[in-house]
Amino acid sequence: MTSKPTTQKSVMYRIPSERTLESLHEMIGSRMSKMSLKNTLRGISNPYERDENEGSEDMIFELFKIPNKNEASIGKLLTVLRQLGLRDDDPRLVPMMEKIKDFEKIAEEKCSEATEQKHWKLTKEQFKECIAPSIDIVSRALQTDMVIPNWVTFVDQIRTLFNECKEIREGQVATYIPQLARQSPNLWAVSLCTVDGQRASFGDVKHPFCVQSVSKAFNYAIVASDLGADVVHSYVGQEPSGRLFNEICLDSTNKPHNPMVNSGAIVITSLIKSKTNMADRFDFVLNQYRKIAGNEFIGFNNATFLSERATADRNYALSYFMKENRCFPKETESLTDALDFYFQLCSVEVTCESLAVMASTLANGGVCPITNETCVDPNPCRDVLSLMYSCGMYDASGQFSFNVGLPAKSGVSGAMIVVVPNVMGICLFSPPLDSLGNSCRGVAFCKKLVSTFNFHNYDCLVHNSNIKSDPRRRDIRERDRLIPVFHVARAGDLPTMRRLYMQGEDLNTSDHDDRTVLHIAATEGYETMIKFLVNVAKVDVDKKDRWGRTPLDEAKFFKHDHVSRFLEKAMKRPEQHRKDSVSSLDTDDEIDDDGFPEKPSFTID
């Protein structure tokens, strides 16, 4: 006796693309067939496709299972995750890594020797226990459900840009303080972090350097989150000044023009926890920096601080001018303390990698992508990106926004951050500066970046140039598409089904049980939808599911007589006439040219 098939649940149906299958199959390098891999990925992304007792952990185990053994290669999983952009020290993977090390320690004690990571093997229960705490990010990564789906290709393109810019020999290292003058002009680093925590680094990314004026962006974001934009902008404006970044001038309302010029940045720092003592204020900002950086390296260079303070005549002149015009909050009693705090924050040390995470937090609406912790409120995050776009590159801000079209902030140490909103943050570091105080290699890299990818703020993503590519884009033939065809068929939503057909969706697709949308429509008895699928979409009427049942069998089983008669006619057509429309059901309804009753015998809810 043939078992009764289960009815498709009302959920979105996700299928892996051929590109995803090929990419993962190559990475995993297993003996698993592409069809088995496809079914496994379906099971990971579509819970209703799995057996009741199977979880995502079981499906992932099957991906990395060693043939003929109840073991899987956890080392292979880690290798694949790295290729997809995730690092072993990613905070979201830390629970998994700790459990792996615990099991590996036990194994080493038994055999009295260390095992290379790539050879790590775990039993099914151990494997599942390891990945369970990090299952969300592991599942997303294996489905390439990330903002940059084809990570390996993207990283190769970035590496090419990095190497091209490495040959640039223009610019001079800043010399106004000894600590900057001693920097090697050959230092060159690029690090990026996406809003999903995918990361890549090139060059001297571990070399520490001071943030200098890059701190202005984060100081504004911190104080605006703490006090609110209205309070902050009662002291500082938002307009580009059109003047030198350290010029002694105010706007028409006697306020600094914006938080990115020196005068505005000094006032901004004076607003940070202005009622507390200096030590607590510094601790507060440093802790905020660490949160924004996902607890990656944040340090302090005291020598740079002392040198900045010793060469501060211009900033003192600015501060006294602002004090005369009552620009500071009333809590600011000592200009020396106010400037010391400003210089301290300019002397905070980072690496290219930690600053890239900070930039990606701004790209991610103020949420750190590797810890999922909200560090900056959404509106201040939006506002700081607007200010960086219009005022972030010293006296070249207008030129940079025109040519590159992305929010950015630079500093005289050679540091530079660039934000692609909702995509990634990039940190560039190269000490040689141009005549306007921006990193020569950094600016050149950004120009090459937007000439390669559709990242410029005003690049059209629809009618785009063939010269540029959009690494975010999932081509209709390649992307992992969320196809609601089974949901639509189950609901009898004919207008939506027609729209999906017009958009090029494959209405012949089948689920894990090889059931098609025609099977579902026949089960429900949706006459007009069946006629549309047969007469217009030309779906396969003979296709059998895993139980060997056709759509006609479904219609007969559920006693939908009119549908049965129509499908019988459709199946009796010779192969050469399969593209012809089948005559109407045996009803008195008038039929239009598309095979739809002009007055349907029932209403689709």
From Swiss-Prot:
Listed Acidic residues bias regions: 586-595
Enzyme Commission identifier(s): 3.5.1.2
Enzyme class: hydrolase
Pfam families documented for this protein: Ank_2, EF-hand_14, Glutaminase
Keyword Transport: no
Chain residues that bind substrate: 213, 262, 308, 315, 342, 394, 412
Keyword Repeat in annotation: yes
Biased composition (Basic and acidic residues): 569-581
Domain of life: Eukaryota
Disordered: region residues: 569-605
Reactions catalysed, as given in the entry: L-glutamine + H2O = L-glutamate + NH4(+)
NCBIfam families linked: Gln_ase
Entries under HAMAP family matching the protein: Glutaminase
Protein name per its UniProtKB record: Putative glutaminase 2
Gene: glna-2
